[in-house]
C-alpha cells in the first residue's frame, strides 16, 4: 500500500493524487465496497434527514461532506470546515463540478489560540500523512513535512446565525475538546447529535464532562446499532468514533439502540 501511494504521488503529483483519492472513496462508498472502518459514513443514512443542517469539522477530502450533502438535500445545509488549503481546494473542485449548492465551505480552523494557527502535515514512518494534519502548537513533538498559517475562529461566532443544527461530525486530530469548548453556546441552543473521533479514555472523559450540562450520553456504533458507553471504563473502545446524543433526541432515535 505504501508503495502504491508513492507510485501514484509520483505519477499524478500531489494535487491530482488528493483529487483521485477523494474520487475513489466516493466511488467505493456508492458501490458499498468500503470496509467496517467506514461504518459511520454508512450510518449517516440512519440519522440524517432531508432539511437537516449539519457541520463537518475537519472535512478533509469530503468523506462525510458529500454524503451529508446528498442526505440533507436541497432544503438542508452542510457547513464544511477545512483549513488546509490542499484539502479545501479538492473540496471546492468537487463542489463546483457537482454543483452542490447546499455545501458552504469554511477555510478556517477552530479550537486554536489567537486569530491564526499553524496547521502541519506530519511525517509518520517516513511518509507524509495527509490524514493526520493538525494544529502544530498542540503537537510540537512531531516532525512536519509542511505547515501553513490559517485563520482561527470561535465556533459560537461561526454558527451564531444558523437557524438549526442537527449534527456535527468533528475529526481534528486531537483538538476535539478545544473545538467544543468554543461551541458550548451552539450546543446548548441546538442540541445536535455529535460524532467525534477521540483517541483515548482521557479524551472521551473530557468530552463527556464538557457536555454534561446539556444532558448528553456517549455511544459507540457496532453492527449498525448504538451501544451506550461507560466513558470511565478501562475497557478498550471498539472504535475511536464516539457518538454523543442529547436526551432531547433519544426518543426519535430509539430504533437505533
Task: Name the predicted role of every residue range.
Residues 1-257:
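Phosphate/nucleotide-binding beta-alpha loop and adjacent structural elements of enzyme active sites
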